């Protein structure tokens, strides 16, 4: 998913550096490397335990493989806990981060009141949630990959223009991972634990490996073997964290925008400052437009992940529950646009972390199943393309 990859990487990298210094990027790399193995298992198990819902649509995700992992009351309760947490973490608190970022970017570029932006985003999202997908979703789907390509090209040109600062940017990342104050003067008061904390937390937000969110998308893919989708999932994390994330990080560091420790600075504003240094005010406008499409697409995707779990929780009245959930999400989108950025991120971090617990318990219990799937996959004849 181009939108989720680019948006989460942009927001994740920028906020990690604001809160934990340049060294947080190093810990995002570390989390991505471990995350590749985790997400391979998640996607493979999501494929193995997928099912068909009441509408005849293929569905799956952690709630389903957790039930398969633990028979009896414990498995049922654990699956319900996960479904509740993801419904809150993504649809509500995660989407608050997205609307907050869109609002901050538009306020910085055009001076528009954040609440007005939040209301517009909420109305557009509400139409899609309640069935009016049509043109809005279609236009977004077509424009997001184009915007992603422009964003990547813009970041590459920006880094090349400031290539002389690249060695210093690398130094700041590696030194800052273990001594934030030595990497950049403004981060003297930042402890190594903060670099690790925000690097891992934003890495989780960025690639979602271990959270249990992406298995919902991987479950519906049509593949010959469950592990084929596991490989796709690994590639997604690689592109997300080791390519897109680095473009954002080096854009900020090579242009020297992270010169002072300011936790009130938003991710969007930091990225806008980097692009403005090379492209003038057009850079801020460009990032605002990119942020809208990337974050808006992520809002839609995360809502549907949450909705799948709401339907799981309310099996007897899924349609009614989904509509109520949609209305609540719309309200949270508006509220998120107006709240302080650190509060929004803290809520998102908390629930993202809580999601990991039941999901990892399910993965751990099914580790032998995952190994059997992998062993069987290795025996498959190589496909001739």
Residue spans for each PLM region:
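Transmembrane helix-loop junctions in multi-pass membrane proteins
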Residues: 9-16, 90-102, 125-139, 157-169, ...
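Flexible loop linkers connecting adjacent transmembrane helices
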Residues: 12-25, 37-74, 258-278, 307-317, ...
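Helix-loop-helix module between adjacent transmembrane segments
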Residues: 31-56, 62-63, 67-129, 290-300, ...
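Selective recognition of specific alpha-helical transmembrane segments in multi-pass small-molecule
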Residues: 34-42, 119-133, 144-164, 197, ...
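Extracellular/periplasmic helix-exit of transmembrane alpha-helices
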Residues: 41-49, 54, 156-172, 180, ...
């Amino acid at each position: 998913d181009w939108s989720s990859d680019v948006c989460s990487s942009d927001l994740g990298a920028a906020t990690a550096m604001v809160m934990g210094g340049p060294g947080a990027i190093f810990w995002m790399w570390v989390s991505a490397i471990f995350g590749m193995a985790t997400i391979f298992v998640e996607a493979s198990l999501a494929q193995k335990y997928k099912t068909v819902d009441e509408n005849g649509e293929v569905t799956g995700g952690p709630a389903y493989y957790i039930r398969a992992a633990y028979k009896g009351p414990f498995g049922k309760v654990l699956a319900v806990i996960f479904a509740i947490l993801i419904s809150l973490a993504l649809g509500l608190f995660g989407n608050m981060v997205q609307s907050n970022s869109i609002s901050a970017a538009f306020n910085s570029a055009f001076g528009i009141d954040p609440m007005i932006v939040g209301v517009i985003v909420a109305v557009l999202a509400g139409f899609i949630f309640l069935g009016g997908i049509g043109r809005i979703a279609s236009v977004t789907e077509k424009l997001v990959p184009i915007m992603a390509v422009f964003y990547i090209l813009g970041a590459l040109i920006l880094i090349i223009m400031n290539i002389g600062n690249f060695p210093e940017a690398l130094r700041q990342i590696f030194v800052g991972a273990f001594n934030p104050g030595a990497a950049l003067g403004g981060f003297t008061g930042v402890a190594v634990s903060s670099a690790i904390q925000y690097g891992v937390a934003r890495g989780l937000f960025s690639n979602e490996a271990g959270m249990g969110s992406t298995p919902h998308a991987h479950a519906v893919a049509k593949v010959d073997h469950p592990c084929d989708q596991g490989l796709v999932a690994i590639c997604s994390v690689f592109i997300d964290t080791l390519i897109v994330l680095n473009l954002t990080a080096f854009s900020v560091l090579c242009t020297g925008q992270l010169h002072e420790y300011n936790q009130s600075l938003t991710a969007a504003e930091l990225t806008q400052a980097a692009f403005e240094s090379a492209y003038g005010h057009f850079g801020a406008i460009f990032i605002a437009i990119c942020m809208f499409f990337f974050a808006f697409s992520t809002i839609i995707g995360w809502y549907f992940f949450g909705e799948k779990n709401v339907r799981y929780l309310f099996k007897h009245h899924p349609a009614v529950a989904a509509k109520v959930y949609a209305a609540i999400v719309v309200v949270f989108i508006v509220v998120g646009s107006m709240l302080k950025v650190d509060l929004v991120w803290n809520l998102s971090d908390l629930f993202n972390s809580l999601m990991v617990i039941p999901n990892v318990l399910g993965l751990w219990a099914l580790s032998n199943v995952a190994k059997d799937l992998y062993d069987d996959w290795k025996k498959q004849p190589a496909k001739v393309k």
